[in-house]
């Protein structure tokens, strides 16, 4: 499903297009940037993962988006909304390119998605984060999220790496 373009002070967020695939994969399959993502390392990615963007504009059940700097047009990262509980809760995913780490972009992205959700009547937001991912844990806490569940885990596809995770929740 496609989301309308969203703007923040510094960012333009829009629905992912097939042509965005290579930029997304640069983050997700990178050893450093994708370290805590479930996506496999580049050398372990299969054809389905490498071609994830084919037909993405027509997929249902979630809103995959890409993020650009409004002034420079630089690709900054990705984010997504997955409506849960009949749309009463939005689950977020996000990734920022390492060139833009520690500049407040993840916070700005999530602030805007929360604002959009509130406008649409969503009252609960969530996100799953590896316990080891210090930066993402800090972003969610800064935005008022608290740990809802701390018993989950996931395996990084194509590897034997298993991460323990927190599920964060924010109720408005």
Language-model regions, residue ranges each:
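Acyl-donor (CoA/ACP) binding surface of acyl/acetyltransferases
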Residues: 1-35, 66-172
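A short helix-loop-beta-strand connector motif used in the catalytic cores of GNAT acetyltransferases and
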Residues: 53-66
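Conserved GNAT-fold acetyl-CoA-binding loop/helix
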Residues: 32-54
């Amino acid at each position: 499903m496609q989301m309308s373009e969203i703007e923040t002070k510094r960012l333009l967020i829009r629905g992912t297009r097939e042509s965005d695939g290579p930029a997304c994969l640069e983050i997700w399959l990178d050893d450093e940037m994708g370290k805590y993502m479930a996506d496999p390392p580049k050398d372990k990615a299969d054809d389905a993962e490498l071609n994830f963007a084919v037909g993405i504009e027509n997929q249902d059940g979630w809103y995959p988006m890409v993020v650009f700097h409004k002034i420079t047009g630089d690709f900054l990262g990705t984010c997504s909304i997955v409506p849960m509980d009949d749309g009463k809760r939005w689950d977020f995913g996000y990734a920022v390119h390492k060139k833009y780490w520690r500049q407040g972009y993840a916070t700005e992205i999530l602030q805007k998605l929360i604002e959009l959700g509130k406008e649409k009547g969503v009252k609960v937001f969530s996100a799953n984060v590896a316990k080891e991912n210090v930066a993402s844990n800090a972003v969610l806490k800064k935005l008022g999220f608290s740990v809802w569940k701390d018993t989950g885990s996931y395996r990084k596809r194509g590897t034997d790496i298993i991460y323990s995770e927190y599920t964060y929740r924010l109720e408005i």
